[in-house]
Amino acid sequence: MGDLLLVRHGETEWSRSGRHTGRTDVPLTEHGREEARRLVPLIRSHRIGAAFVSPSQRARETARLIGVRDARVDADLCEWDYGGYEGVTTVDIQRSRPGWFLFTDGVAPGPPDHPGETPEQVGERADRMLAKVDAALAATDGAVVLIAHGHFLRVLTARRLGLPPRHGALFQLATGTLCRLGTEHGRPVIAGWNIRPREV
């Protein structure tokens, strides 16, 4: 069975400033585009059997820039719905909720179009996505690539390893990086994390 490759989109103005960016559709910065372009040799070193991408423009542009042009858009790859914390930094949230932590405390309710998600709800989406990944891996001898978002991919990694969604907190994930999840003796493992070309 092939590897599961995770690509976090390149930098945006909001990711650079630490603002929670769930459903707000912000573009990549020029630095974010360069981060993505520099991943091309790493992507080309793998045989790609299937690819999926979040609907957001930052993820779709990253997919295009890394040379993955036939990725299937899948809403299960959307970033965590931050509800009332959309666009707010952790520092600002903690001014009113000291000790607040996304992976255990969740988010404040938001408007009807993005009401917010609990860690468990994000975990359920990750499980659905992993079922699609496993079906794709069974149908090809290549790797499957997911181009998506930091917090969601951290939860997905935890679920791949059999951990609760809150354990996504253990996996710091930088913009414009590649991660590789594989298997050892039939069990899921992290084979590479936050991989970047040396010149970045």
Please name every model-derived segment:
Residues W100-L137:
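Internal catalytic-core helix/loop-beta-alpha segment
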Residues H149:
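Short basic (Lys/Arg) and small-residue
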